[in-house]
Structure formats: C-alpha cells, structure tokens
C-alpha cells in the first residue's frame, strides 16, 4: 500500500467556514475551473455537497474532490446482519435520567461496533433533530464508514483517536472535538489501547459559530483555533469494506480501491477539529450566574428563530467572582432539552454521582439543579474569588425532546436512584428576613 502526503501529514489549515484548498501532489488542483475535460494527473473531479444548490451563498457548503477513483465506483449495498443494537426509542419517560460511565468491551470492538445509542429526537430522515451515542472501543477500524443521516460531532473522553478522512488526517484527544460533515467517509484508528467518548449526530443545519451580539468581535470559540486537514491520500487496489448509516440502519459494500484516494480538494464542506482548552470563557464580574448560552461552542439553528436545533455547550475551568450570589448553576425548568456528559474532573452542580464518561438527560420542563450537598455548601460559602479547575463538562441542548433508546433505559449503567440527590433538600425558609 502506497501512502502519499506532505512531509508533515498532520499539518492543518486554520479557520472556520473558509474556502480551503489543499493538494498532496503539485497539479492536483485545476486552475480556473472545477471539472476539466482531462485532469493533468488523470484524477476524477467529484463535488461533495452539504447543502442544496440554491441556498443563500452564505449558507452554501460544498467541496470539490480530485480523486483516483470516483465514489460512484462501488457495487450494491447490502443490509448488514449486525446493526446498532437497542437504538429503537424506548417508552415515553419524563423522568430525569443519569448513567454511570460505560465499560470498555472485553472482546475486540472497533469504533462502529462500539456505538451505544442513548437518545434521539426524531426519525433520521427528517432535516432536523439529533441522535446521541456513546462509543467504547479497543480496536482500530479496518473498514471505512460514513453517515448519510447527519453531521457527526465527536467528543473524546478517554483515549486518543486518529481520524482518517477523505480530506486528510485529524488527531484528537480528550478535551478536543472533531466534526465530520454528513456523508464524509472516515476511518478511526486508536492511538491508545482503548477509547471512549460521546457523539452527537446532527440531522439539521450544519454546525456553525454562534452570534456574539454585544460580546463583540472576539470571544467564545475563536475561528482561527479551528483546524482542517491538509490533503493526504492512499493509492492502493486492496479490497476494503465501506459501511454507511442510512435512516439509522447499517449497509455495507466492498471497494476494490481505497476510499481515501483524494489527491487534492478545495471548498468549505470540510472536517475539522477544535481544542476546548482554547475557549475564551465569558462570565459575570459583578453578580448572578449568567445563562449557560454564554458557553456555546457551536450551534445548529432550528426552525424557530433563536431556538437551536442543537447547541454544543461546555463548562470549562473558570474564575467565580460573583458577589452576593448563589454561584453554582441555578435551579431550572427549561423549555429546551439537555443531555450532559463529563469529559474530565467534576461538575460544579453535582457533588457526586456524575462521573467522567457518564451522562445525564433532563428533558423539557424536567426540574433540575444543584444537588443538596452542593446547594448547602454554596449557601454557606465565603464568597472569595476562586477558580474552578480540572473540569470539562458539556451539554448537547436541543429544542426537540430527546427520547431515550431502548438500550439506555435497560442498561446496567442507568442509575435507579438519581432523584435521591434532591431528597431532603435543606429547608432554609425564615419568615423574618436575614439582617
């Protein structure tokens, strides 16, 4: 197998939403046109569209690929015998739910077989909503994969990953994320003995940076910190399995060439990575706890103006300086639906029970907030400036109800006693105001 790349295969291009271009060999990118009659290197021109042709130019996403064999060169797909087990939506359940960390399998399992379905909003053939998975794997993929159902946001919690994409290579580790466009072929190699993390499959409009409003022209996730691959390709004619996810089902075909044979490309429908440690956190310097929307990294807009199909929000290390304020996240009943995970450390609203690799789900109007231990400490605390360190929690927040999967409601990781953390909330009511 011949592998071709630049001298530094893991160089990246910087920026968000750019019209990127990259070639692994000189002459791979045609000049002045997209689809020449005869490509100088004998490559096929293929357009990879992420939006309809007629959307506003500011919304359009497409990339031109120059590859050794066109993607169309494949035989018929066959439905696979092994599907994503337990992904059917379970019975309606308004309760607050929390899960312990999911185990790494004992037997060899790759990234795709290691998918654990937790929740979804609606059928994947609709142009909105999300599906949420955990992955737990201990073996690198030998096959290739793509999802026709949505864009993938991958959040590692344990173990480093190398993601081979049609556009090049992405290395990510815990505290970094990767985003793969709908339909992009990829393969995941484990750089450690095992890996675990979270996936949000976005069925709606592609993720983008949130508007900053009065914050101004800088802050939150800055565009220059997003990294996109440079061109990299394989030139071989060895058989390889290609799996696609289509309407929630897995289908397979076999290629006689590598699906990662793109020698050059240009466009803005791209894979990218981002280091969450570079997030410019905004918070109060006077009083009260601002709404968590100030921690939004990426957003996919929904049909209702101002209401997201999905917001990806993080709770990173930060200084707490608010005066005369209950500093943890306040008690809340939300129109939106909140799925939370923990990458590292502890979450400041929960003293115990919410561990790295675990998850929680608070659906529309499910009352939630700090547990009793956290609330008692916050009420009694001396309000000196202090820094919350060694933490990284995140939230997938969506305007649609997240229905837990059949697997999520029946697995041993589901905590039967989650509601108990709010039992015996200390009564502090006093008819006479405090002096």
From Swiss-Prot:
Which Gene3D superfamilies did the record assign?
Jelly Rolls (2.60.120.10)
The text of the family note is: Belongs to the homogentisate dioxygenase family.
Q: Which CDD domains match?
A: cupin_HGO_N
The UniProt record lists the EC number as: 1.13.11.5
The UniProt subunit note reads as follows: Hexamer; dimer of trimers.
Q: Which residues form a coiled coil?
A: none
Q: Which reaction does it catalyse?
A: homogentisate + O2 = 4-maleylacetoacetate + H(+)
Residues at which Fe cation binds: 332, 338, 368
Q: In which pathway does it act?
A: Amino-acid degradation; L-phenylalanine degradation; acetoacetate and fumarate from L-phenylalanine: step 4/6
The entry's protein name is Homogentisate 1,2-dioxygenase
Q: Where does homogentisate bind?
A: 347, 368
Q: Which UniProt keywords apply?
A: Dioxygenase, Iron, Metal-binding, Oxidoreductase, Phenylalanine catabolism, Tyrosine catabolism
Which one of the record's GO molecular function terms can you name?
A: homogentisate 1,2-dioxygenase activity
Instruction: Specify the enzyme's EC class, one word.
Output: oxidoreductase
Q: Give the active-site positions.
A: 289 (proton acceptor)
The UniProt entry's GO CC annotations, sorted and at most eight, read: cytoplasm
Task of the protein: Involved in the catabolism of homogentisate (2,5-dihydroxyphenylacetate or 2,5-OH-PhAc), a central intermediate in the degradation of phenylalanine and tyrosine. Catalyzes the oxidative ring cleavage of the aromatic ring of homogentisate to yield maleylacetoacetate.
The cofactors it requires, by name, are: Fe cation
A GO BP entry: L-phenylalanine catabolic process
UniProt-listed InterPro entries: HgmA_C, HgmA_N, Homogentis_dOase, Homogentis_dOase_bac, RmlC-like_jellyroll, RmlC_Cupin_sf
Keyword check for Amino-acid biosynthesis: no
The species is Pseudomonas savastanoi pv. phaseolicola (strain 1448A / Race 6)
